[in-house]
C-alpha cells in the first residue's frame, strides 16, 4: 500500500481528516476513477457537486461564507477568472504546486491549470482539399463567405480566444477581424464544439473552430458515424508562424471558506502528479499541464507537437468583458 501511495503522492503526508467537498464543472467518468484512487490512497472521501460552471458560481455566491466547498474546478480561464474576481478562492500555500505548474497557468496564487486544450480550426476536406489555412485571421478571408460556423459569442471558449487576440493583435484589429468573420458565417451561431465538427463534415459549413479534445473524442469513438465524421475533416493548429495556437485550461483552487483546506491542498497536489496527469490525458483527451509527461493516448499524440501561445491564463480571463463588448459590437450573436 505504501508503494502505491508513494507512486501518486510523493513527499505528501496523509491527512487525518476524512472528507473533501468538490465543486466541479467536469462530468467525466474518467475523473471519477481519479477521485476513487485519491480516496483509496488517503482515506479522504470526496463529496462531489457537479454542475455547469455558471450554476456553480451562483451556488457559491448564494452560500457565501457558509459554503462547504473545499475545491472548485472550472473549465476555461474566463470562468476561473470570474470565480477569482468574485472572491471564491483563497491563496494557495504549496511550494510543490508553484514549482510544478508553469507560471503561465497560475493566477495570483489563487488557482492553477490542471489540463490544457487548444482552440483549433477544422476544415471540410472535400471543399478545401489543399487550401492553405494558417491562422485565426484567415477565418475572415472573403473566400470563406457563408462557410464559417461557431458557438455563440457569449460562450467562454469564444471569449477566451477573442481575449487572447485583443492582447496579441490589439482591440481595433480584433474588432475588424470579428466584423469580417460575422460576414462569413454560414448560420446563426449555435450548438457546442462537436456540433461544429459535424456541420463541417456534413458540408453545412466549410470551416469552424473547436477545442482539440472534442475532435480527439470523435477520433477515439467506437461509433462508426463518429469515425466517418473524422474522415471528412482535417484540422489546423493556427498561428504557428506568429503567436502560437491559443491554449486554454481546466483549472481549480481552494475555496475561500474551505472547511478542509489541508485536504484541498493535498487534492490539488495529487491532481498535478505525473500519474494523474497521464490519466487526464488518457481519459479526456487533454494535454497535461506539466511538461515531459508521456501520453498514453495515441489519438491525442497524433495531433503532433505545435507552437503554443504563451499568454498568461489570468490575463486572458480578465479581458473577457472587453471581448464580449467587442463581439457584440461586431454583430456576433
What are these regions (language model features)?
Residues 17-82, 333:
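Early extracytoplasmic/lumenal segment of secretory-pathway proteins
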Residues 23-26, 89-96, 107, 110-112, 123-125, 131, 137-140, 224-246, ...:
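Short beta-strand->loop
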Residues 120-127, 163, 247-260, 279-282:
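A bilobed periplasmic-binding-protein/Venus flytrap-type ligand-binding module shared by bacterial periplasmic
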Residues 146-154, 270-294:
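Periplasmic-binding protein-like
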Residues 164, 169-238:
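Ligand-binding pocket segment of bilobal, Venus flytrap-like solute-binding proteins
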Residues 173, 285-333:
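An extracytoplasmic/periplasmic, membrane-proximal ligand-sensing/linker region
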Amino acid at each position: 500500500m505504501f508503494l502505491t501511495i508513494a507512486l501518486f503522492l510523493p513527499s505528501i503526508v496523509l491527512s487525518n481528516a476524512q472528507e473533501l467537498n468538490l465543486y466541479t464543472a467536469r462530468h467525466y467518468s474518467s475523473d471519477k476513477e481519479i477521485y476513487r484512487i485519491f480516496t483509496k490512497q488517503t482515506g479522504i472521501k470526496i463529496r462531489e457537486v457537479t454542475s455547469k460552471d455558471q450554476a456553480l458560481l451562483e451556488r457559491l455566491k448564494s452560500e457565501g461564507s457558509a459554503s462547504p466547498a473545499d475545491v472548485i474546478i472550472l473549465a476555461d480561464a474566463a470562468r476561473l477568472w470570474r470565480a477569482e474576481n468574485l472572491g471564491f478562492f483563497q491563496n494557495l500555500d504549496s511550494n510543490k504546486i508553484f514549482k510544478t505548474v508553469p507560471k503561465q497557468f497560475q493566477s495570483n496564487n489563487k488557482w492553477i491549470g490542471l489540463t490544457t486544450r487548444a482552440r483549433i480550426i477544422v476544415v471540410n476536406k472535400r471543399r478545401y482539399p489543399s487550401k492553405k489555412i494558417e491562422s485565426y485571421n484567415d477565418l475572415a478571408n472573403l473566400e470563406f463567405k457563408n462557410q464559417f460556423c461557431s458557438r455563440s459569442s457569449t460562450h467562454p471558449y469564444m471569449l477566451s480566444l477573442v481575449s487572447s487576440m485583443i492582447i496579441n493583435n490589439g482591440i481595433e484589429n480584433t474588432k475588424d477581424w470579428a466584423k469580417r468573420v460575422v460576414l462569413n458565417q454560414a448560420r446563426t451561431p449555435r450548438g457546442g464544439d462537436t456540433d461544429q465538427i459535424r456541420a463541417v463534415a456534413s458540408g453545412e459549413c466549410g470551416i469552424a473552430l473547436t477545442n482539440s479534445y472534442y475532435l480527439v473524442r470523435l477520433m477515439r469513438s467506437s461509433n462508426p458515424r463518429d469515425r466517418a465524421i473524422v474522415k471528412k475533416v482535417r484540422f489546423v493548429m493556427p498561428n504557428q508562424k506568429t503567436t502560437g495556437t491559443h491554449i486554454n485550461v481546466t483549472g481549480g483552487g481552494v475555496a475561500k471558506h474551505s472547511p478542509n483546506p489541508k485536504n484541498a491542498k493535498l487534492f490539488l497536489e495529487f491532481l498535478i502528479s505525473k500519474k494523474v496527469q497521464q490519466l487526464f490525458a488518457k481519459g479526456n483527451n487533454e494535454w497535461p499541464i506539466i511538461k515531459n509527461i508521456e501520453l498514453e493516448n495515441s489519438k491525442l499524440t497524433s495531433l503532433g507537437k505545435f507552437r503554443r501561445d504563451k499568454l498568461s491564463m489570468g490575463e486572458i480571463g480578465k479581458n473577457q468583458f472587453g471581448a464580449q463588448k467587442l463581439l457584440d459590437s461586431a454583430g456576433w450573436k
